[in-house]
Structures are given as C-alpha cells and as structure tokens.
C-alpha cells in the first residue's frame, strides 16, 4: 500500500463545536498511532477531501509527522471549489493552513457546489485513488463516514482494498490511558 484515504465524522456529528475540545486530542492520538503503523508498512501518500472535523484533524497529524517522516505526503482533493465559503472564520483559517502545508491540492469537480452528486463523486474518487481507507467510525452511529465505507466495501468485493476502522472503543482506551498518565503521582514513583 502506498496511498491511504483518511476520513471520519464531521465535527458537529461528534458534538464537537470548539477547536479546543478535549476529544480532538484523543482522535488525533488514535490517527497518529494508525498513521505511524501505515508509514511502517510503506504508505507514502495520505488523502483527504478537506471536510471539517476528522479529516482536518488527521491532516494536522500527517503534517506534524512530516517533521520526522519527510517522505510522507498529504493531498487535499476537495469535492468542489470554495467548499469553505460558508464556514466560520476560525475553521477557514485552519483549513487554509492545511492547504498551504499540503503537498498537493486540487478540486475534483473544479466548480462550486451544485449538488450532492459532487459529494458522491468525491467518495468514489478518493476510494478509487487509494489503496485503503482509515476511518473513524461507530457502527451504531453511521453518519457521513458510512458513504465512504459503502464505496470502499464495493471496491473490496472486486479487488484487495484495505479498510481500517478507528472505533469509539479505541478512543475510550486512549482517553483512559491519558487519564491514568495524568493521575500518576510522581512523588510515589
């Protein structure tokens, strides 16, 4: 595998409405663990569509890891032009910072939003252009990642295609580990 698509829920689907929400830290840690494993397996390119939420947080992880793994690259393939036009200023700034740090940026349809067909095309395109999918997903709460998974599972029936899930259990484990590390009494070591 050389190319992986990173995705998951939009921030509001997770009940995250602040860039300082503690849950973002756990999501980033989970993606960092998986991305490091993928780098060890030979993955060089990480693809996102630039959607608010998990995709941008995962992109921040890739950008951070480029400092120690300069051979990895980030591509942002937006479903349509100016997808950030209706976002809040803080989200637009974060998005533009990621675009500036990305190694490749393009728009799949090369025109502004026209309808949901552009989003379906985005899912198909990113799955087609990658060797696998790393997705934050809860089977009890399908949400937006289910559209990627549907396309990925169809491809998987035709040919080898790697699908890796980060689950709520993974995030709980990271949160518990973090709490244990915070509660260690240094004086008693």
Curated annotation (Swiss-Prot):
SUPFAM superfamilies registered for this protein in UniProt: MCP/YpsA-like
InterPro entries associated with the record: YspA
Pfam families (UniProt xref): YpsA
Family in the record: Belongs to the UPF0398 family.
Protein known as: UPF0398 protein BH1768
Source species: Halalkalibacterium halodurans (strain ATCC BAA-125 / DSM 18197 / FERM 7344 / JCM 9153 / C-125)
